[in-house]
Structure formats: structure tokens, C-alpha cells
Amino acid sequence: MGTGAADRSRGARWWLPWLGLCFWAAGAEAARGADSGEVLPDSIPSAPGTLPHFIEEPEDAYIIKSNPIALRCKARPAMQIFFKCNGEWVHQNEHVSEESLDESSGLKVREVFINVTRQQVEDFHGPEDYWCQCVAWSHLGTSKSRKASVRIAYLRKNFEQDPQGREVPIEGMIVLHCRPPEGVPAAEVEWLKNEEPIDSEQDENIDTRADHNLIIRQARLSDSGNYTCMAANIVAKRRSLSATVVVYVNGGWSSWTEWSACNVRCGRGWQKRSRTCTNPAPLNGGAFCEGMSVQKITCTALCPVDGSWEVWSEWSVCSPECEHLRIRECTAPPPRNGGKFCEGLSQESENCTDGLCILDKKPLHEIKPQRWSRRGIENASDIALYSGLGAAVVAVAVLVIGVTLYRRSHSDYGVDVIDSSALTGGFQTFNFKTVRQGNSLLLNPAMHPDLTVSRTYSGPICLQDPLDKELMTESSLFNPLSDIKVKVQSSFMVSLGVSERAEYHGKNHSGTFPHGNNRGFSTIHPRNKTPYIQNLSSLPTRTELRTTGVFGHLGGRLVMPNTGVSLLIPHGAIPEENSWEIYMSINQGEPSLQSDGSEVLLSPEVTCGPPDMLVTTPFALTIPHCADVSSEHWNIHLKKRTQQGKWEEVMSVEDESTSCYCLLDPFACHVLLDSFGTYALTGEPITDCAVKQLKVAVFGCMSCNSLDYNLRVYCVDNTPCAFQEVVSDERHQGGQLLEEPKLLHFKGNTFSLQISVLDIPPFLWRIKPFTACQEVPFSRVWSSNRQPLHCAFSLERYTPTTTQLSCKICIRQLKGHEQILQVQTSILESERETITFFAQEDSTFPAQTGPKAFKIPYSIRQRICATFDTPNAKGKDWQMLAQKNSINRNLSYFATQSSPSAVILNLWEARHQQDGDLDSLACALEEIGRTHTKLSNITEPQLDDTDFNYSRQNGL
């Protein structure tokens, strides 16, 4: 028994005798009641309503921290009220009593309370909790109250079980478990979503009553969020770790479209139908639809058969009208499947008596003879024939003289080219003779060249007329031609000169006229009112790479250095006596083409213009792309931006079209177009095996802190212009390329990309914990056409004396390919080896015009076109030329051109602008059997000094 209980016992001894006397009296009364057969009650019996009745009994209580608690009792009628705690009487001095009178009953009401301290509860070591009870006395008996327990309140800090994050499909069940910390009294649990309380009474879909767990019966998209379990009692509140719940939507296929028409009009082709992963579209990391988005089946279209005539029948018997006839039928073969009917007459008739026939129903012998003889008739016919021929000769002579005089009167200077090699072929020199004595090619005030240009010259000028000289070749490919005499009128600046200007990031390169002639083109006026150069009223104003050049009838090539983008204007695409300032730009800002669904941008947005310019033959636009086209896992489209800013599909690369042509190479797409505008390539992955080609590179630079060194790892689309943007950014930041960039194949399998720094030298360098590996989500890499994707790592030296850094950087796709970049460098610029940004810097002028822009000499090109544009019974025509140059599809496009061979050669020029591989073209011609001499065997000495100065660099 505790010390306090003993004190209470000694203090109560003075009233115990009196209490015993009362009990003796009550016992006597009880004995008398027992003799009368009544049951002994718990309290001493008395008259009804005379025993003490508790109006207020002590309640269970909790001690918070060190604050004592008060236990109260109130009873009537009561002479005394005492507390008994743990079976021991509480000392009278610890009681506080108050007495009052109940006005309604006139009975005395006594109220007593005591304080229980934390120390008293802690010192008690009984089999049960610390408890206290009230005992009330009246003159007739006693009454006892309920036992009230007293406990020390607390709440542990750590949850026994924190809720865990979940990823569930839509309409799935979510169960978040929570076991609150141990506490007295037991903690109440409340759930928070995004720091807001959850009221399960207002949402029937949520249940929070099941053993502190949170149950969401059918997950909705709005149920995604951060959930927290909150536990609280009278002592404190505790928060669990937040659990992130993601409700995702797996993609579902839409219905199949109708089967497309057969892609060929004749023969074996294919039909396709497609569906999109939009029913529903994947959301919040949901799985992409499984299966193919495009289905293809073969189809066979009946080829149209044109009708052909049978042989003529025998002549019929001479009719009374002195005519006989013959017929033929269109049955060899007859037209079928929409083929053309035979052209020409199905029957012929002619006189069958050589003019001797009955006239007006009269016999021949009754016709009166004419006055002249048969010989006279023949002489009259000869006179008429010779008279007609003489008149024709005179008319031709007058026409030739008139044309010659007209051309001379409209020309400031001219040359007569006498080609003596046309019979034999080959590269020969030319004899020039001037029309006027003393005429030179120098610009003088008396001359008025056919050109008006609104800006100064910026680039080289070729001072010879490429059309004044023809190159011939000794080859059996070409048929001998008769002697020709060509008179060429030249426009001094349009045909002989070029105006170029390259602009990058808005910087203009000023230029002057060559040979010290610092004069603007605006001082030179044309003879007529129509200006030859049509200047642009506006150019693209977005963030872009841009280059411009002036092109005339000779055509040329416009190149964006180190971007893979180029524009080929064929010879003759621009009408004579006209020139255009043509520009080309690459959008480096936010792409205006927003991808739909699974479609991704595979190339830069390339703009060429002016948009209102018309060409007479298709030009070739080369656009780089980053798709791996070695396997058929892509559906690639060419798109064009409209004037309203929207994008519309021009064609699919695999489709047949007569409006444009797309030739897809491993790293670039060559497009033949008739109109200028903004174009881009997009791709829709057909399967998860579709691959994008990424270029990975690492740059490094010192940090502001002299001990830190920063590494930046880039993963960008494998297009030269994308990497050029990275190079430009790094140059501004002072970064240096530490290892040659490498190629990474990134699959469309929805798995993320990991970038890790490995093998850092210990005791020399260190990297912050948990930062050596970074992960990039799949969607960020797959659609990385917004800004260059990169991860930054910060390395710290232990001492300033460390100047060498070696490590490995691993770039890998989960369940995909990986690349290792080996970094071995010095952080001091004086000791670092410079790695060039590009394997071959393009230092050529952005614009080239005339023959220098083309790999195939113009004369050879003309003869190839003349040879292969002519149909051949053995099939050795332009179709064979296309086949030998790996052009096997959409041949109907070339069939619609006026010169299919010229368009094929334009495509060859676009594909071989870097290598100028004339050997491949020569081999193709040899295989066809039309030539036995390779074009690449043409040597420099065969060219005259005044010719086009082709060099080996131009492919010859």
C-alpha cells in the first residue's frame, strides 16, 4: 500500500468509532428485516428515497502531460462523501466539499472533488488501471458511485503503417491502409486529399470507416492526388507520409476506318485502313494500345487495255459509184477495263477506176474531150509546185533576216558560238566572235543590263555565261548531231552573276561588288518596266536559321550549312528574263505543328519561299529526319502549313501521288514540289518497334566554384540542325565537346531513358549522393522537339591540383539500346584537345547558281534527257533510268512530267549533293546498255580555261 493511502487511513481514525456505531444500528435493523423474510439489500434499508442518490458520478479521466485532473461527486441527501482510490480511503484534507440545499425537495446536496496527480498514477502498480470511487452517507445508509479510471494520455510519433502510393486503372478499387501510432486514448483517424479533409458522408464512393483504411470503390480521374493519414487524440496530432495515387487510363483503339482504294490503277497494289489509340487515349502513364494501327492487304486492279486495229481487209468490188472500200476492226486487242478505243478510221474508200468513171450517169465516151493534152496537164502541175517552193524559201529567208535584226537591235552585245564538235562529240573548245568590234564583258555606262536588284552584292560572281558554252562527250550514248550555230543573248547579271546573302540568327554579312566596284544594284535599271528581281515584302520573323540567294533561269542550289537542309532549283524552273530572291529558313522556336495522338515530329519545320513564286518544273527540297527507316514500323507523312497557320497532310510517303514525290533516305527525305511554303515530316509508329535516332553528346565547363566541374549530357533528334542548336547554346555557355557524339536508337516501347555517370576516380573527384543517375520519362524523349533535352551533373574536385577527369557516361533505354561516352579530358583549356562540333564544317557559300551548282554538266544532262525521254520498244527509257537509280515507286508522278528523265536527274542531284558520285550514274547508264564510258573518267585537261571550271570537288 502506498504512503499516501496510509496517511489517509490514520487521518480517518477519529470518525471510525462513530461510523461503527452507525453500522451497528443499521445491522440491527437489517436483522429484524431478515427475521421477517426480506432479502438484505446492498445498502442499509430505510424509508423509500432516503438513501443518498448520486447526481454526478466521477468520470474516466486522462492526465495530459503533468496537469492534475479533478474527480467530482454530487449526491443527495448526503451527510458525508468520501473518495476511495484503489481500495484506500482518500485523506479528508484532500477533499474539497460544498453543501447546498435543493429548493425543490428541501434535501441537502453535497458536492465533493479531489485532484489526482501524474505522480500518484505513475506510483500505482496494480493489476488494473488507477481508479477512484465515491461513497456517500446518510443517517439511513450509504451509496457507492461508479469506478472512474485515471490514465496518463500519450500518442507515439511513428505510424505503425503508412499508406502506400498506388497506380490503378480507371474504375478500379483503391485501398489505402493506415495504422495510427499507439496512444491513450486511442487516436482518431482522418484522411486528407491534397491537404483537404475527405468527407465520406458526402461521397458514397469513398469509405473511411473500415479499420482506419481508405477505400475508393470505383476510381475516377479526379481521385488522383496525394493522400495523407491524420491521427489525433487529446494529446497531439500525427501525420503519415503522403501516398500518391495515380488513376491512369489505358489506351483503347477506335473503330477501323474504311479500306482505302487500291493505291495503283493497274496491277498489284495494296489497300490500307487505320485506327487511332483515342478510344480512350492513354492518360497518366496508361499503356498504349497493343496491336497495329495500320492494316494493309493486297489488291489487284485490272489494267486498262487500249484497243488496237486489226489489219485492213481486202478491197471490196468496185461499186457503181466507181469506189471500193476496205474495213478494219478494233479487236487486236479490243479495249478493256477503261482502255482507249483505237484512233483513226475504221474504213477507207477510194476511186477504183483511176478517175475513169461514169459522170452524171453518162458513159465515158460521151464526155467531150478537153482542149489540152495530157502533157500540158503535167506541165501545169510542175509550174504550180515550183512556184510554191520558191515562195516558201523566200518567206523563210525573210523570217530569218527579221529575227536576226530584231535580236541584234535588242542586244547590247552578243556572241556567235560555232560548235565544231557536235558531229563527233567530246569536250572541245569554242570559237567566240563578237558582234560588235571592241565589245567587252566589262560593265560600262553605255550598257543597260537586264536586272534590277534592291540590295548590294554579297558573294562571288561568275563572269561567264554558262549557256554560251556547251560541253560534249565522246560516248555512244548520244547520237551524232548536225553542225549547229547558236546565237545567245545574255543578261549580264541574271545569267552571268549571282547575288547571295546568308543570314544566321538575324546577322547580315555585308558585301561589296567584286573588283572594287562598290555600287548598289539599285543603280542598274532594266529596259522594260517589269523588274527582273521580285523582292520579298516580308520574311519569316520567328526564331530561325535563314539564308537567301538570287536565282534566275540557270537555277542553282541553296544550302543551309551544317543543317542538312538544301533547296535545288533546276535549270529552266524559273522563266527566262526573270530572277527571284529565294529564301530558306528553319524554325528553331516552339514548333507550330502540334502532334496528334501518337504522331511525333521527325524533322525541323523548313520554310522556303517566296510562297507566290511559280516554277515550271519541280524543285527538290531536302529535309533531314530522325526516323530509323530500315524497318517498316513507321507511317511517315509530309505536312504543309496553310496560310491560316494550320497543318494539313500533303501525302504519306508510301502513297501514290502525282502532286509531289517523296524519296526517303536513311537520314534525309528528298521532296519534289511545285509550290513553296513550310513543310515538315511527321511519323506515326505502327508498332512498338518503331525507332527514333538520337544523337547523344557530352559537354563540360568549369563552374563558378573553382573546384566544381559541370557535365551536360544532351539527347536530341539526330538531325544536324537540332545538334547545331545545342552547339550554339554551349558556345554561349563556354561549354566544350568532350567526346564525339554517338547515335542511340530509341524505341517507342514507352520505357524511359537513364543517364548515369560511372567510374569516377576515387579520392580525386566526387559527385553528390543520389545524383549520379538521372531518369527521363519516355514522353519527354519521344517528343523532344521543344527544347534540347539534357541532364546536368556537377562533379567536385578534392584539391585544386586535380586537372584530369576521366569517367564514363552511360545513356540507356530500359529494355532498349545503350551508348557509352568515354570522357578523358583536362579541365584546363590550355591542355584540352579540341573536338570539332561537326565532322566536316560546311564552309561553302550558302547559294550556288548556274553550272557550279550541279554535278552533271548541262550538255550531258540534255543528251541523257533526249535519249531516255524517247519511248523504246525494249523498255530502255526513263523508267529503266529510274529503276537503276533505286526509284521504284510512284512512277506515275514522273509520267506526268514533260521530261521524266530531267526530274529523275534532279532527284539524283539532290541525293548526291555531298558526294557527287558520278560513278553511280555512269554505272547505271552502262547497265542499261546505252553507254560504255564512265562520266567520272572526264579529266580536267579536256576543258578549256574559259569553260565552267569544274573541279574534282564538283564530281568530275
From Swiss-Prot:
Outline which residue ranges sit on the Cytoplasmic face: 404-956
Q: What is this protein called?
A: Netrin receptor UNC5D
Q: Where is the Ig-like domain?
A: 52-149
Q: Name one Pfam family in it.
A: I-set
Residues annotated as site: Cleavage: D419, S420
Q: Which GO terms describe its biological process?
A: apoptotic process; axon guidance; cell-cell adhesion via plasma-membrane adhesion molecules; pyramidal neuron differentiation; regulation of neuron migration
**Where do the ZU5 domain residues begin and end?**
545-685
Q: InterPro entries, per this entry?
A: DEATH-like_dom_sf, Death_dom, Ig-like_dom, Ig-like_dom_sf, Ig-like_fold, Ig_I-set, Ig_sub, Ig_sub2
Question: Using the chain's own numbering, where are the disulfide bonds?
Answer: C73-C134, C85-C132, C178-C229, C262-C299, C266-C303, C277-C289, C318-C352, C322-C357, C330-C342
UniProt domain Death: residue ranges? 862-939
Please give the GO cellular component terms listed in this UniProt entry.
cell surface; plasma membrane
Function summary: Receptor for the netrin NTN4 that promotes neuronal cell survival. Plays a role in cell-cell adhesion and cell guidance. Receptor for netrin involved in cell migration. Plays a role in axon guidance by mediating axon repulsion of neuronal growth cones in the developing nervous system upon ligand binding. May play a role in apoptosis in response to DNA damage. It also acts as a dependence receptor required for apoptosis induction when not associated with netrin ligand. Mediates cell-cell adhesion via its interaction with FLRT3 on an adjacent cell.
Q: Which residues lie on this side of the membrane: Extracellular?
A: 31-382
> What family, per the record?
Belongs to the unc-5 family.
Q: Indicate where this protein resides in the cell.
A: Cell membrane
Boundaries of every Ig-like C2-type domain copy: 164-242
> Which residues are glycosylated according to the annotation?
N115, N226
Quick one: where's region Important for interaction with FLRT2?
Answer: 89-91
- Give the record's keywords alphabetically: Apoptosis, Cell membrane, Developmental protein, Disulfide bond, Glycoprotein, Immunoglobulin domain, Membrane, Receptor, Repeat, Signal, Transmembrane, Transmembrane helix
Question: Which SUPFAM superfamilies does UniProt cross-reference here?
Answer: DEATH domain, Immunoglobulin, TSP-1 type 1 repeat
Q: What are the boundaries of the signal sequence?
A: 1-30
**UniProt GO molecular function:** netrin receptor activity
